[in-house]
Amino acid sequence: MAELTNYKDAASNRHLRFKLQSLSRRLDELEEATKNLQRAEDELLDLQDKVIQAEGSDSSTLAEIEVLRQRVLKIEGKDEEIKRAEDLCHTMKEKLEEEENLTRELKSEIERLQKRMVDLEKLEEALSRSKNECSQLCLSLNEERNLTKKISSELEMLRVKVKELESSEDRLDKTEQSLVSELEKLKSLTLSFVNERKYLNEKEKENEKIIKELTQKLEQNKKMNRDHMRNASTFLERNDLRIEDGISSTLSSKESKRKGSLDYLKQVENETRDKSENEKNRNQEDNKVKDLNQEIEKLKTQIKHFESLEEELKKMRAKNNDLQDNYLTELNRNRSLASQLEEIKLQVRKQKELGNGDIEGEDAFLLGRGRHERTKLKGHGSEASVSKHTSRELSPQHKRERLRNREFALSNEHYSLSSKQASSPVFTNKRAAKASNMGMGTDSGTQETKRTEDRFAPGSSHSEGKRGREQPSVLSRYPPAAQEHTKVWKGAPKPGTESGLKGKVEKTTRTFSDSTHVSVPNDIVGKGDKTSDLSSEAHCGKRGQVPGHASQGTQAVESSCSKAIGALSSSQKASSEGLSKGKKTANGLAADANFSNSKAPILSKYPYSSRSQENILQGFSLPNKEGVDQPVAVVMEDSSQHEALRCRVIKSSGREKPDSDDDLDIESFVTAKLVNTTITPEPEPKPQPNSREKVKSRGGTRTALFENDKNAAIENDSVKPTRPSSNAIEFPDANCAGVKNQRPFSPREALRSRAIIKPVIIDKDVKKIMGGSGTEVVLEKQKSTSKSVTSKVTSSITIYPSDSSGPRAVPSEAPRERHTSTSNIQVGPPELTAISNHVSSPLELSIHKHDITLQLTEAERVGDGSPKNRAEMVVSRSSILIKPSESVEKNSHVPPAETIRWKSHSASSDSRHITVRNAWKSKRDLKCSEDPPTGIGRNMEATNAYTQRPCTDFLELEQPRSQPSEQGARRVGNSGDAPELSPRRTQSSLTASEVLTRRDRMGGAITAASCNHSSSMEEGEDSTFVTSRRIHNPLEHSELPGKQGLPEPEPVWTEERLHPAKPYAEED
């Protein structure tokens, strides 16, 4: 080591020595440079001194020197001119000498050229002579060539003539042989044609017999089925008639063709016979050859004709077989329809027998079994008869009718369940599609005037229209028992092709989907899983459930979705019909949301049928403080091809008064058929509402129904209006009774009014939470663990702040618009509660509505006064996919992460893949930072533990939280081609102004604007639907009461995605 260190030291010392030497050298160089610089400076200074001295002394000598210089320059200039002249002289001499030499050379060249000229002249003379000789030789050659050509052409002509003669001899030999053979063939062909003619005549006779038998069978079938056709389905008669017409037309046309072909054959044979006789008389071979060729051609045409006749016979046999099959299927259909008619008649008789019974066990029956209000078929017979139904208060008879309706609904549901077990969903779908397609081309105009059509397939169950025709009693128009009655009218949708509908005056078919109203008991309402108990109790749900959903759980889920006030008022009267008679539905096919899955393929074959399927508008009407209800103006803007629908509803606000009764969860859900009416009614004064008529503030959101009966008030407690003119649909609380339909306007006003309504789907959840002093703690616990599934709604939503029409409304508030295009929003739900067991399952809700318009106007006023809010939602044809994310840690109160995924599945060229972030423009003044999320998860418990987990927190503390509404879980049936009924209730923006009178209660009213309709998607197609969503200005916020600060309502995020037509099978 020491050596290494020494070596390193030595090396470093050397290096330092070299550096010192180099630095010393540089210093020496620098010193020398400084010395040189100093010397130069000294010399410069000396020179400067000398110059200064010389300038002072030599000025005179310099002037003399300049004069001398000028003289010298002049002398030098003269010398230069002399030198130039001498140079010029020398050059001139040289040039002259050169020119003399050139002239001598030119002379010599001229002499040479002259000699050559003489030689060339001699050559030219010789060339001219030779040219003359050559020209003579060329002429002689050309003459010889022409002669040789003539001779060769003559030789070729002779050769061709010889060949022609030889070929003609050969041809004559061949033609003689061919004529002999063809004559033999003709003899054999004539024999075969005679045999075939006999065979064809026999076949014709057999076919005529078959045709006669078929016509006799069809006539017998018509006679057998006339009674059934009159009562149940005239479209079957029309199909039979069309079948008969098709048979007769095709058979007659083919008989005529056959007869014409046989006549032609006879003529051809006569001609051939005549020609054969003439041939015997003729002796010239050429004529015989021509005739034989013509006969051969004619016989070939005959052969082709016979082949075509054989093909036609084969086709006729196939068509006869098809007609026989169709005949058998029609017989089976007629039998099934007859059996169904008998069952319906028996059920109607049972209902009529039950009409005299008591109604005492109604409440227990409703709570135990669930409430099943069924939509009824209403015939469009005459406007006067319909107007009788329009305004009615409830009477004891109507109470009995409601009880009968419920029992009939239960019996129908048992029938549907048995039919579901009996038939597989694919089979029922195919059979229903086949049965429905037979009547697609039928005349919708005459059908509507004749009768109401019972609309149900074997797998589905629909309520009948006979009870819809029952005339209300006189007592029904008076208020004492008015709150008990719910009357839902459903116009029978008439199948028909679009072309069939174009030429016809079509009465408006209005279908209001099954409105199953379930009132929740108070003990259930207090719990966090109110709707789950309801869904488990009301096991029957909607009757139009998909056959594929064999499990009770999905039925309960659908029932919980459809449990809502669906009663569009029965006062959708003749005025709305009569004014809309000229109005054609955009699609020939309008179908219920309640059609069972087996009947949905009818809709799926018509891509635009969904526009007219359901118009759902749920309205809550609140009586004014002064007792006067403001007019409702609904203006529908009809865009081309029903692509976009905009509806503006202006409703007056009413003062709400809290009632002392317990709150109930009211899920209001209405589906309405396409109603073509424009309503411009005039206000009618309403009397002062009595104490029971006070509307709960929680259910106070009002939307205008698109009918003459536009105002509907959902009242949680039993409400007794004093006048039938109060336009409200009210839910009584005490007896869990249904909706009361009232006439807002006189029939004259209704006749004057018009409303053109395109498909509207509104699903409202009005959630009432029973309040007490002790519920606040429970509420916070539930808020921390609240879960709600984000509703993925494919829709176009336009939300405007409503026009301020109330006395305390802010008049100068201008509506702000905000367009947000969203699609496929998936929000992860918060953690599961430690108490309840949740099964995370994907849900798919498919919406096939082309246009959905929602309008919300809040009539409630807080103490300071707040503007009414109007939400307008246009939902285009779409599919909704709700997939709750996997369950996360229990007991964790962290708000859920929000994941937004945009999916755009489309085969169309203009499909767009859009990603839009959550950008909601909302007022922050109502935001309470200390408030936990107010969403209260409502656990849905189905019988098969198929539960839906709600998710509430959309934006954690950045945006006001929306109240979670009940999420409807929908399962897609196993059948691939069957569109599903997708009733569900989704989250919606909470109107905070409703909180005025609920300071002592903890829950917030929730209006869920959701799209609930049957998704009649394309059946076997992979066609996808492009859906767009526009979100206009979110609802404006009103001030909260002092004690309870409800967070500001947040519009529901909805999903827009291009969804393939086939539904997905969901996991349980």
Curated annotation (Swiss-Prot):
Keywords of the record: Acetylation, Actin-binding, Cell junction, Cell projection, Centromere, Chromosome, Coiled coil, Cytoplasm, Cytoskeleton, Microtubule, Nucleus, Phosphoprotein, Tight junction
Ranges in a coiled coil: 11-354
Modified residues (N-acetylalanine): 2
GO molecular function: actin filament binding; microtubule binding
Residue spans of biased composition, Low complexity class: 785-796
Annotated region (Required for interaction with FLNA), positions in chain: 834-884
Acetylation listed as a keyword: yes
Phosphoserine found at: 256, 261, 395, 513, 571, 575, 612, 660, 691, 746, 906, 988
Subcellular location field: Cytoplasm, Cytoskeleton, Microtubule organizing center, Centrosome; Cytoplasm, Cytoskeleton, Cilium basal body; Midbody; Chromosome, Centromere
PANTHER family tied to this protein: FILAMIN/GPBP-INTERACTING PROTEIN, LEUCINE ZIPPER PROTEIN 1
Function: F-actin cross-linking protein. Stabilizes actin and acts as a negative regulator of primary cilium formation. Positively regulates the phosphorylation of both myosin II and protein phosphatase 1 regulatory subunit PPP1R12A/MYPT1 and promotes the assembly of myosin II stacks within actin stress fibers. Inhibits the phosphorylation of myosin light chain MYL9 by DAPK3 and suppresses the constriction velocity of the contractile ring during cytokinesis.
Protein name from the UniProt record: Leucine zipper protein 1
